Structure formats: structure tokens, C-alpha cells
């Protein structure tokens, strides 16, 4: 049985770049043992009649040594800074790349004082930069958390669904506050036999500190 990752784009799922930030996103998660054909399934909806679907594309590329990438805030296009470009980036269509890694999100906000004024990596840039650099869900988590560690986090509290054809994770992240670079984050793997969801509320209530 061939196992695939299916990413369902509900109406408005991909219009984040051209409109004010949607704080009404919903993610549905189905583990591979909870689906009839053994596929990991995730869906992503913006839950708004004002957002209309757009399909983004980044072609796979090789980049010269020393190349830099401009980061712009995903919702407003405000320039945030530059980061070194990876030597190789993968093909991305929508919210999935050529290796069947997919990333979606929902915003839960959190305490305003935990925002970071000088961070470079906002939630949207984290998604699409990481998709271009990751071959698995676990590599995407490492990429996202390394990026905010090195360049700061420029968004409020977020829940990310991060999946590949074998497993799916929820990564939650919020800034450390004024003058503190990076983010506080936790990632938990969704069991293969589980169905889960998140919609603008933090989902991880207990942190298993002994499970790494």
C-alpha cells in the first residue's frame, strides 16, 4: 500500500500574503493509522469569507555561496531583515514541498509582552523557508527552531502542524519578551492512531520534559 500525505486546502487557506492576518485558522490532523489507506492527512482553513485561495510556488534551486535571502513579514510585507540562503532549496507548491513535508498553522496570540520587536522570522516566513529546506517533519521542526534561535521570532503565539508521509507533529511557539532573542517552543508528535485539531487555541497543555 502506497502511503501519501494529503494536504487539503479549504477555501481561503492560502491567502495570507495579500490580506490582514487571519486569526481564525483551523487545522485538522489524521494520523496514518487513523486513515483508511494509511496516509497522514492534514487540512488548513482560514475560516473567513474575506480570504480567497492562492497557490504559491517556489522552484527548487541551487544558490551561490554567500547568497542572502530577504525576509518580509508575511501579512504586511514589511521588511524584517536578511538571513543566509541555503545552498539548495526544494520545490514548494502551496504548503507542501517535493518531499511531502507540509506545514500549516493557527494563531493563538498569547501575552503581548512576550513579543520580540527586533525578530526577523515571522510565522509565515518560518513556514515557507522551512518547507524549502526540509526533507522530513523532524527536520522542519529543527529548521524552524534554529531560525528563531539565530534570527529572532517576529510573531505572537502560534500552533504549527508539521507533517510528512510518516508522521505529524504540533509545534507551539511564542516569543521570550522584550530584549530576549528567540522563542519558547515545544513540539509533540500526534499518535499514529489519533485524530486531532487546533483552531486559535494552544493545544499543548502538559509538557513531557523527560521525553526528548
Regions found by a protein language model. Name each.
Residues 8-17:
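Bacterial N-terminal signal peptides
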Residues 18-24:
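Sec/Tat signal peptide C-region and signal peptidase I cleavage site
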Residues 1-9:
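Bacterial N-terminal signal peptides that target proteins for export
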Residues 115-117, 125-134:
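Second-shell loop/turn segments in exported
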Residues 25-123, 143-212:
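A contiguous strand-loop segment
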Amino acid at each position: 500500500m502506497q502511503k501519501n500525505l494529503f494536504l487539503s486546502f479549504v477555501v481561503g487557506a492560502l491567502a495570507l500574503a495579500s490580506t490582514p492576518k487571519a486569526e481564525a485558522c483551523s487545522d485538522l490532523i489524521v494520523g496514518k493509522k487513523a486513515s483508511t489507506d494509511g496516509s497522514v492527512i492534514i487540512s488548513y482553513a482560514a475560516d473567513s469569507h474575506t480570504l480567497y485561495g492562492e497557490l504559491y510556488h517556489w522552484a527548487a534551486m541551487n544558490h551561490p555561496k554567500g547568497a542572502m535571502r530577504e525576509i518580509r513579514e508575511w501579512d504586511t510585507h514589511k521588511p524584517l531583515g536578511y538571513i543566509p540562503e541555503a545552498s539548495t532549496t526544494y520545490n514548494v507548491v502551496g504548503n507542501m514541498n517535493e518531499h511531502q513535508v507540509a506545514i500549516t498553522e493557527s494563531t493563538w496570540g498569547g501575552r503581548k509582552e512576550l513579543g520580540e520587536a527586533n525578530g526577523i522570522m515571522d510565522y509565515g516566513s518560518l513556514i515557507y523557508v522551512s518547507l524549502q529546506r526540509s526533507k522530513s517533519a523532524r527536520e522542519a521542526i529543527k529548521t524552524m527552531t534554529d531560525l528563531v534561535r539565530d534570527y529572532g521570532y517576529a510573531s505572537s503565539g502560534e500552533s504549527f502542524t508539521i507533517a510528512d508521509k510518516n508522521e505529524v507533529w504540533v509545534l507551539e511557539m511564542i516569543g521570550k519578551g522584550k530584549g530576549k532573542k528567540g522563542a519558547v517552543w515545544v513540539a509533540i508528535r500526534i499518535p499514529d492512531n489519533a485524530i486531532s485539531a487546533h483552531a486559535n487555541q494552544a493545544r499543548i497543555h502538559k509538557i513531557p520534559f523527560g521525553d526528548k
